[in-house]
């Protein structure tokens, strides 16, 4: 009976661990605005891309954004690397006339670990290059 309980506990732990490993993690938070992006009237005027500061602008005065054709795409805690990989879905595909990028705060805070200032700047430059290439 002791061996059976140990074996059963081992199987339960293994199943729990395998289910955690099998879960997909949306590191860049692609899903955050996926449904809202489908409802945007194209082309949009301005997309505000950023972190919690940008998200706060939208949350504090969403009527101002809506009345002016502005779209808020800030996500709390985001780093420039995360913003860069979701830039196509949350900015380019919305065909804005302009984009405002507020980025770098969470990189400096090392939310995803250390990143050099050169790489932070490189991510921001890449976003601006993508915006220019698709304008």
Where are these regions (language model features)?
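Serine-esterase "nucleophile elbow" of acetyl-processing enzymes
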Residues: 21-98
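A periodicity- and composition-biased signal for non-globular, repetitive helical segments
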Residues: 11-12, 38, 108
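Alpha-helical cap/lid subdomain in secreted, periplasmic
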Residues: 2-3, 63-68, 85-135
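Bacterial Sec-dependent N-terminal signal peptides
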Residues: 1-24
């Amino acid at each position: 009976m002791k061996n059976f309980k140990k074996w059963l506990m081992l199987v339960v732990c293994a199943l729990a661990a395998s289910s955690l490993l099998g879960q997909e993690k949306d590191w860049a938070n692609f899903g955050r605005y996926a449904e809202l992006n489908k409802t945007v009237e194209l082309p949009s005027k301005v997309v505000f891309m950023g972190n919690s500061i940008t998200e706060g602008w939208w949350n504090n005065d969403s009527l101002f954004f809506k009345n002016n054709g502005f779209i808020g795409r800030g996500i709390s805690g985001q780093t420039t690397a995360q913003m860069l990989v979701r830039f196509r879905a949350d900015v380019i595909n919305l065909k804005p006339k302009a984009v405002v990028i507020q980025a770098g705060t969470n990189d400096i805070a090392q939310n995803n670990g250390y990143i050099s200032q050169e790489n932070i700047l490189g991510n921001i430059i890449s976003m601006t290059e993508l915006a220019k290439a698709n304008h």
